[in-house]
């Protein structure tokens, strides 16, 4: 903000990169330890958690006003990337070529964000530079110092989390994919949750939303791209359950942002409550899988019907209001 950069751009880039660091280190650590399923499920689970829980809780604190930049550009881009990841991983392998493509898209998107920092929008105004008692150089030194220590601590934490997750999966006889989608994803998404909650309390809704959208982009472009390259010529193995169930859910939750963001221009408390409900149903689905109940298919049909009913009714209701206006 000192440089007069809009909050939404900071959220989509700098803050998103910082909050996605745990996912990056944990997923890379998982690949190096031969646990591709943990690496991929961490990314997918984090993206689902970010949209349903982080946006849900943040909007319960205060309705999140959505800038038109998010609607017309960033969310469609996130949808396109999510669909591309689903398509490229449909064979069960995210190849190293796919990794190069994802990292190239990250480069293009970063250049795009930098070149449009001062873009004029109908509801975006560049933040005024704030006066700070310290010099910019002192701030920079302090920031770099914190960054170095943070990376060191994250590296140790990532190693412990991956080892602990693998041990837990072996002890309980649970697939690493489920551990990655739930426990690991929740743990690595805590920075996004805390950042967006603090931003919501301070009324910086741009930062709260931009952090989530930016983190979800980085999770797929940077983390999956890096992991697939780190896996060598064989590529990153993608569990069949992720391809059939969890990646489609990730794509659907991303699509769900459009009717919420596009109409009325904000995420209301009620919509945040619905997002949290959907995540609870998602976790219940995983619990039913572990318990091996026979009605898992019926429960999933209920989730899909609930999901479609809620968001279709919300979309139609808000669209009707816009037409009347």
Please tell me what each predicted stretch does.
Residues 1-325:
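Hydrophobic alpha-helical segments, chiefly the membrane-spanning helices
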């Amino acid at each position: 903000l000192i440089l007069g950069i809009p909050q939404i751009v900071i959220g989509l880039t700098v803050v998103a990169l910082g909050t996605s660091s745990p996912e990056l280190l944990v997923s890379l650590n998982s690949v190096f330890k031969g646990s591709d399923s943990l690496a991929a499920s961490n990314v997918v689970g984090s993206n689902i958690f970010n949209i349903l829980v982080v946006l849900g809780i943040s909007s319960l604190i205060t309705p999140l006003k959505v800038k038109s930049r998010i609607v017309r550009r960033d969310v469609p881009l996130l949808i396109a990337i999510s669909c591309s990841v689903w398509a490229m991983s449909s064979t069960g392998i995210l190849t190293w070529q796919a990794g190069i493509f994802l990292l190239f898209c990250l480069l293009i998107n970063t250049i795009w964000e930098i070149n449009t920092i001062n873009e004029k929008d109908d509801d975006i105004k560049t933040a005024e530079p704030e006066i700070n008692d310290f010099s910019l150089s002192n701030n920079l030194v302090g920031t770099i110092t914190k960054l170095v220590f943070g990376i060191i601590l994250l590296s140790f934490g990532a190693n412990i989390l991956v080892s602990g997750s693998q041990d837990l999966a072996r002890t309980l006889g649970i697939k690493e994919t489920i551990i990655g989608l739930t426990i690991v994803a929740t743990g690595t998404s805590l920075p996004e949750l805390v950042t967006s909650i603090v931003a919501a309390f301070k009324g910086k809704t741009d930062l709260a939303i931009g952090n989530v959208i930016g983190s979800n982009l980085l999770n797929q472009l940077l983390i999956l791209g890096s992991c697939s390259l780190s896996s060598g010529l064989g590529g990153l193995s993608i569990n069949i359950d992720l391809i059939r169930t969890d990646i489609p859910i990730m794509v659907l939750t991303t699509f769900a942002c459009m009717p919420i963001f596009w109409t009325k221009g904000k995420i209301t408390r009620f919509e945040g409550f619905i997002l949290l409900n959907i995540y609870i149903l998602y976790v219940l689905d995983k619990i039913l899988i572990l318990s091996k109940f026979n009605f898992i298919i019926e429960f999933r049909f209920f989730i899909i019907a609930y999901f479609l009913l809620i968001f279709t009714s919300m979309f139609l209701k808000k669209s009707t209001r816009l037409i009347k206006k």
